[in-house]
Amino acid sequence: PASGCVIPLIPDGLSRGRREIQNLDAAAARSFVTAAASFLEKQVQQDGSFRYGYYPRFDRVIPGYNCMRHASTIWSLLCQYRITQKASVLSLAARSIKYLLSHALVYRDPDTAYLSEPLKDEIKLGGGGVLILAITEYLDLCSEEPRPAILRSREPLTKAPNAEIFHAKDVLPEQEALRRRYTEIACALGNGILSLLNPETGEFSHVLNMDFSLKERYRTVYYDGEAAYALCRLYRLTKEEKWLFYAKKAVDHFLAADYTRYRDHWVAYAMNEITRYIHRDDYDTFALRNARVNLDFLYKRETTYHTFLELLMVTFETYERILAENPGLPYLKEFDLPYFLRTIRVRADRMLNGFFFPEYAMYMRCPDKILGSFMVRHDGFRVRIDDVQHNIGGFYLYYKNYSRLLALGMPKDIPCEEN
């Protein structure tokens, strides 16, 4: 709004103190994505690392660093690029990839790589997964962009590349060299994931020491979905059957162990991807159940928990494809579409309680620093790069699919008591 305008604020309820968004449409969702992604752009430092985050009440910097969260945040920058086509965003993503490859990529042998956490002296399964996602998404956009920011390195593959960013006049040869090199790195990371997979059970080991010995067999369920999704994206990139074969092993374990109980958005991403290539009723059913059996919990959750909208929106994309490709699926009769769509609308509105509007930011020590970002209210209004990332992911998919959501019956508005 123009300076001097009076903006009415919601007087009570969960959304007390923020402006009411009368029409949370595609344009509104786009504005939240671009604002939050612009915040992330400002966090990219000269060496490609991010300013990790803040506790903004007292403008305290969050200590430490997490390379896995760094990798997944690159994905959010690329969502911004898909919307705005700003070349500077692609360059920032390139710089951020360079940082990881220079500081955190480790090789067990010439064909097997991992993303390490140097400050923790450990290797996480999920780290390799999200770095594959960042690389494959970046390569997708480079193939669409006529003059991308190229990362070039003459280092041998057995060493972490020391890349530099430049704009090439002769784009096509450089672009092809980039694609080959980054495909090699992504495949080496994929082999790292496979080294942590039990092919008999489909279970992953989660954390290694820096000498590649096992540190923790299990840490968090998120790693499983990240790894399976990454294997599926490697299949999309290379068309090598082995990636899909082993992704199937992991997904079979998700079904056998009923991973719907975890309400995991990464599992939703993995199922959305694998059902593009493997057409089985049990896979389609599980992909839909992963959201359906959790709708009551997602609908009633009062916090802004940032991965829930991602889970719902990824499942929406899966639902649409199943409806077109497998309309006879028996579970479609059990899938409560109106409740599902209503839950999406409620969660999208609930997420706004975590957006740093000016009326929230003004209470923080340095409002300008966190304006337009997303926060975690129940942890001191924390603003961390991965918090912003997940909010961008959910709203980007909401923006992308908004017209289809309305066409299938999502309400434009929700009752005020649900705000």
PLM feature spans:
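Sec-exported extracytoplasmic/periplasmic mature domains
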Residues: 41, 45, 78-82, 105, ...
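Extended, well-ordered alpha-helical scaffold segments
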Residues: 24-40, 85-103, 144-156, 163-164, ...
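Acidic, Gly/Ser/Thr-rich repeat motifs that build Ca2+-stabilized beta-propeller blades
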Residues: 93-94, 128-130
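CBM-like carbohydrate-recognition segments
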Residues: 65, 279-282, 300-419
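Low-complexity, Ser/Thr/Pro/Gly-enriched N-terminal "stalk/linker" regions
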Residues: 1-68, 92-95, 103-111, 159-165, ...
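Well-ordered alpha-helical scaffold segments within catalytic/enzyme domains
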Residues: 11-26, 71-88, 129-148, 162-179, ...
